[in-house]
Amino acid sequence: MSAALILEGVTKRYGGFTAVDDLSFTAGRGQILGFLGPNGAGKTSTIRMILGLMEPTAGRIEVLGVDDARKVRNRIGFLPEERGLYRRMTPVDAIAFLAGLKGLSRPEARKRARIMLEAQGLGAAADRQMRNLSKGMAQKVQLISAIVHEPELVILDEPFSGLDPVNQQALEGVIRGLAARGATVVFSTHVMQHAERLCDHVVLLARGKKVFDGTVTQARAVAPRSLVLEGTLDEAAVKALPGVASSHAEQAEDHMRITAALASGSNGQEALKAAFAQGLDITRFEMREPSLHEAFIVLTGEAA
């Protein structure tokens, strides 16, 4: 089976500015792909080109086996970063209207809308006007509008923005459910924890260029592991241990907690052995694996 999404050498220039520079990646069927990068990295321009909303300056894009997403628009679901629904419509009417544009009959669209609203805890709000819903509720309605027609490819641009932790967790469940039924999900986010929990694969952009393309585990491997020490400690002594590249100290109520980032190639054993040999007062220690957020900073030079 062919990939759901293929980009080969895609470039987008606006006058003399290159927003996307020779970008290539693939999203497989049923895969959850995190499309990550700081502001201005080129994510939105890429999404617009994938959807056929603008043409690339160079390169090739294949969506669900065709060269133009507009030919298969009824098989694609899209949640834009800038939300917008008709404020005087009810959730049922808004969802049914957008579903009709994707080829669903009105009765089927309204039936699905009510079922999905109920599943998201919005059954009681189904017939209230959108302007009377909270921001979180309205975002749920817009998400339902993007997936009510059961698309094969779902593109979500910053879907977690503005959601409280409970609704963020609920959205994670929706994304997993989409992938479980075979849909490909591509989502952009600045919240690395979501990508870390959800993604089979991540593509990371910085200044229009791809700087990483692989699994979350592979991404984390580019950042250093850390040795965390607690006790009556001196940061300078810890920083001087073999294999330690840098350190950060935090004063707790009755002890010092020092996180020592290890140099490339160091497993921390040498530093730990030296610490005990020097008689450092260590009451607790742990080896900590890097997070995706830390890998993001290493790869892009910027915070998420």
Where on the chain are the PLM-derived regions?
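Residues at or immediately flanking beta-strands
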Residues: 60, 129, 226, 281-284
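C-terminal coupling/interaction segments
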Residues: 263-304
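An acidic, carboxylate-rich microenvironment
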Residues: 58, 71, 93, 108, ...
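Structured loop/turn residues at secondary-structure junctions
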Residues: 125, 135, 190, 230-232, ...
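ABC transporter nucleotide-binding domain
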Residues: 172-262
